Curated annotation (Swiss-Prot):
Organism, scientific name: Macrococcus caseolyticus (strain JCSC5402) (Macrococcoides caseolyticum)
Annotated GO CC locations: cytoplasm
InterPro entries the record matches: aa-tRNA-synth_II, aa-tRNA-synth_II/BPL/LPL, Anticodon-bd, Anticodon-bd_dom_sf, His-tRNA-ligase, HisRS-like_core, HisRS/HisZ, HisRS_anticodon
SUPFAM superfamilies: Class II aaRS ABD-related, Class II aaRS and biotin synthetases
Taxonomic lineage from the root: Bacteria, Bacillati, Bacillota, Bacilli, Bacillales
GO molecular function: ATP binding; catalytic activity, acting on a protein; histidine-tRNA ligase activity; transferase activity
Primary location: cytoplasm
Family: Belongs to the class-II aminoacyl-tRNA synthetase family.
Any one Gene Ontology BP term: histidyl-tRNA aminoacylation
Name the record gives this protein: Histidine--tRNA ligase
Entry-linked Gene3D superfamilies: Anticodon-binding domain, Bira Bifunctional Protein, Domain 2
Keyword Methyltransferase among UniProt keywords: no
Location of the protein in the cell: Cytoplasm
Length: 420
């Protein structure tokens, strides 16, 4: 029986990997423009990292993690998100002692969640994210949101919106939590079992429940902005002032709460409004986390970051019918005769060593078939290598797009292609 790909995963084939490389390269360059440095963490971590860092009451920890025991009977989990692992690395490697504060990091790699498969959502997916750790300053919150805005604009996306909210500090959230309990408790029997279980542990999760988000009592629930203390209000106002200064458009939504327990103060999402994008409109989410490092037994440092889905970014680009300049061509295809194959192998190797992208026939095709192959792989030039060309040390190089040919020396192929 044929073995198929696991459910909820995908093969990214050569026709698509060019787009992925283009997108990821641009993301790396944008992060570098903001002085963020790349960090790479393991794809699996101690399960306790996510239970404590992400939050035991979240859907991720309760339902979506891929957890297993290793041969040493240790509980390990394939990472479902990037922030907790980056913060763990920051603490473990004592980056808070670095004079270059805040520490600005970015990551790019696969994450794993056991979710129901649908368009734009996979069980293995790729996230690009940034974390700025060591500064509690509204200006760096604005910097992170500015980077997000520039990322989507750099791909030519027009139908996006930034949704912004503050979920306050821990004191504000505690007061808000009590207000939510009082609001939902008389109606809790109308809610799903998850919401019932979360009423007294984390009632904010009820607000973004995937089952009950249309409940009337959810829509009439008190807003976090009504419970912000003076510090939280002032912090939020300063963030908005910086965003206005940077001409970044945003929409305030007091019902926005992020699905992870570690968020405080600034919370934001980027949504696609493009027709045909699909039911899942969130492209990116992020926010500030002022207590996460202490929750993981780290120093009293604060951070802010975001994570975006590469898959959903590509879907948004497709939905807006944006063509990426990613056509990959071969510089030259060497057409061979049976008697010149060995010489062609040598010439092709020399061209590759000179930095020329080239290929040749390995199936013994006739000349016509080789020319068709050159066309299929979008070769810029072709040369036909026969015994006469080897004897005279001269060859005709043909531009495939125009059909024009020019006679040059064999040893000059590389410099001709480079325009030297």
């Amino acid at each position: 029986m044929m073995i198929n790909i696991p459910r909820g995963t995908q093969d990214i084939l050569p026709a698509e990997t060019a787009k992925w490389r283009y997108v990821e390269s641009k993301l790396h360059n944008i992060a570098a423009n903001y002085n963020y440095k790349e960090i790479r963490t393991p794809m699996f971590e101690s399960t306790d990292l996510f239970a404590r860092g992400v939050g035991g009451s979240t859907d991720i920890v309760q339902k979506e993690m891929y957890t297993f025991k290793d041969k040493g009977d240790r509980s390990l989990t394939l990472r479902p998100e990037g922030t907790a692992a980056v913060v763990r690395s920051y603490i473990e490697n004592k980056m808070n002692g670095d004079a270059n504060q805040p520490v600005k990091l970015y990551y790019n790699g696969p994450m794993f969640r056991y979710e129901r498969k649908q368009k734009g959502r996979y069980r293995q997916f790729v996230q690009f994210g940034v974390e700025a750790i060591g500064s509690e300053n509204p200006a760096i919150d604005a910097e992170v949101i500015h980077m997000v805005y520039n990322i989507y604009k750099s791909f030519g996306l027009k139908h996006i919106k930034i949704v912004l909210n503050s979920i306050g500090d821990m004191d504000s959230r505690e007061e808000y939590k009590q207000a939510l309990i009082e609001h939902f408790e008389p109606h809790i029997n109308n809610f799903c079992n998850d919401c019932k279980n979360r009423l007294h542990t984390n009632p904010m999760r009820i607000l973004d429940c995937k089952v009950d988000h249309e409940q009337p009592t959810v829509k009439t629930a008190p807003k976090i902005t009504e419970y912000l203390n003076d510090y939280s209000k002032n912090y939020y106002e300063e963030v908005k002032q910086y965003l206005d200064l940077l001409n970044i458009p945003y929409i305030e939504d007091a019902s926005l709460v992020r699905g992870l327990d570690y968020y405080t103060h600034t919370a934001f999402e980027v949504m696609s409004e493009a027709e045909g994008f699909g039911a899942i409109t969130t492209l990116c989410g992020g926010g500030r986390y002022n207590g996460l490092l202490e929750m993981l037994d780290g120093p009293k440092e604060t951070g802010i970051g975001f994570a975006l889905s590469i898959e959903r970014l590509l879907l948004a680009i497709e939905a807006e019918d944006i063509q990426l300049d990613v056509e990959e061509s071969v510089d030259i295809f060497v057409v061979t005769m049976p008697e010149t194959v060995k010489e062609a192998v040598k010439i092709v190797a020399e061209l590759r060593n000179a930095g020329i992208r080239c290929d040749m026939d390995y199936l013994g095709r006739k000349m016509k078939g080789q020319m068709k192959q050159a066309d299929r792989i979008h070769a810029t030039y072709t040369v036909v290598l026969g015994s006469n060309e080897i004897e005279t040390n001269k060859i005709q190089i043909k531009a495939m797009q125009t059909g024009e040919s020019e006679t040059i020396k064999l040893q000059d192929i590389a410099s001709y292609i480079k325009g030297e």
